[in-house]
């Protein structure tokens, strides 16, 4: 069991919109897709609460990775700062 590999975890890239909480940031992830019926390009965004272990601040572009539940809302953690 110890040599068993962990499955791939989801990763997303977004912008930090809030870093006022202690060790927690809010990351906005934007998704652009074509509407299936009307073929219009739609821009959609979603906010994720992520554990901040790298001390990132507002406006930073970061990569977040899925992890175990850390609190009621946090299921993601900041992996790296993307330039």
Curated annotation (Swiss-Prot):
GO terms for cellular component: cytosolic small ribosomal subunit. Pfam families: Ribosomal_S17 (PF00366). PROSITE patterns: RIBOSOMAL_S17. The keyword rRNA-binding applies. InterPro entries: NA-bd_OB-fold, Ribosomal_uS17, Ribosomal_uS17_bact/chlr, Ribosomal_uS17_CS. The keyword rRNA-binding applies. Gene3D superfamilies: Nucleic acid-binding proteins. GO terms for molecular function: rRNA binding; structural constituent of ribosome. GO terms for biological process: translation. Keywords: Ribonucleoprotein, Ribosomal protein, RNA-binding, rRNA-binding. Belongs to the universal ribosomal protein uS17 family. NCBIfam families: PRK05610.1, uS17_bact. Part of the 30S ribosomal subunit. One of the primary rRNA binding proteins, it binds specifically to the 5'-end of 16S ribosomal RNA. This is Small ribosomal subunit protein uS17. It comes from Chlamydia caviae (strain ATCC VR-813 / DSM 19441 / 03DC25 / GPIC). The lineage of its organism: Bacteria, Pseudomonadati, Chlamydiota, Chlamydiia, Chlamydiales.
């Amino acid at each position: 069991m110890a040599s068993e590999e962990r499955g791939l975890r989801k990763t997303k890239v977004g912008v930090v919109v809030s870093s006022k909480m202690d060790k927690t940031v809010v990351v906005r992830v934007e998704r652009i897709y074509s509407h299936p019926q009307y073929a219009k390009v739609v821009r959609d965004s979603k906010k994720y609460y992520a554990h901040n272990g790298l001390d990132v601040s507002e406006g930073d572009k970061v990569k977040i990775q899925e992890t175990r539940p850390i609190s009621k809302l946090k299921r993601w953690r900041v992996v790296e700062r993307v330039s």
